[in-house]
Regions:
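Rossmann-like dinucleotide/flavin-binding elements
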Residues: 1-39, 99-100
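Flexible, glycine-rich terminal cap/loop adjacent to redox cofactors
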Residues: 29-30, 34, 46-182
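Helix-loop-beta segment of a Rossmann-like dinucleotide-binding subdomain
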Residues: 40-45
Length: 182
């Protein structure tokens, strides 16, 4: 018995159901081409505004003990967002704090269900924030927001490191501050 779609349960999305059906058919006809689902599944809700996610969210990652940081960029400051009038949309990247490996992303706003494929591909290929910083995005495009979300993430990470170093230096007594014995 092969099953696909809503009967399988979560996530009950058309895109996932179609991939489940392809896998089921390959198993049913013993075709070796596509024998399993991909590990990275994007979720998209075609509402106004569109909402899309992939990978782990910030809370989920922390609940699993993964030390993460985020980077965000608003469509309000993105030239394409300004042109099309989407000033409420944003992209959010979730990455591991130790090696900057991308583990999740969210997009809210115009084209979110299309844009989510950029971080989905990055997660699939184990990309870090460096990918988004080094990538060249068309201008003006909403996709360019990923670059600025990566820069924001690096700034947040730097602030975290600076605070930790500052706390460590306060906890360590300075040389020469001890009172000499009398």
């Amino acid at each position: 018995i092969f099953a696909a779609g809503d009967i399988v349960g979560f996530p009950a999305l058309a895109s996932t159901a179609m991939e489940q059906a392809r896998v089921a058919m390959c198993h049913a006809f013993d075709l070796k081409y596509k024998m399993q689902m991909g590990a990275v599944l994007p979720y998209g809700v075609w509402t106004v505004p569109e909402i899309a996610t992939v990978g782990m969210g910030e809370d989920e990652a922390r609940a699993k003990g993964v030390p993460v940081e985020i980077g965000k960029a608003s469509f309000r400051t993105n030239p394409r967002g300004q042109i099309i009038g989407d000033t409420e949309g944003f992209v959010k990247l979730v990455f591991k704090a130790d090696d900057k490996l991308l583990v999740g992303a969210s997009v809210v706003g115009e084209g979110a269900c299309e844009l989510i494929h950029v971080p989905a591909t990055a997660i699939h290929f184990n990309a870090t924030l460096d990918y988004f910083i080094e990538a060249v995005f068309n201008y003006p495009s909403l996709g360019d927001a990923f670059k600025y979300a990566a820069y924001d993430g690096l700034q947040r990470l730097q602030r975290r490191v600076s605070k930790a170093m500052e706390a460590r230096s306060r906890a360590t007594p300075s040389i020469g501050t001890a009172t000499p014995p009398t």
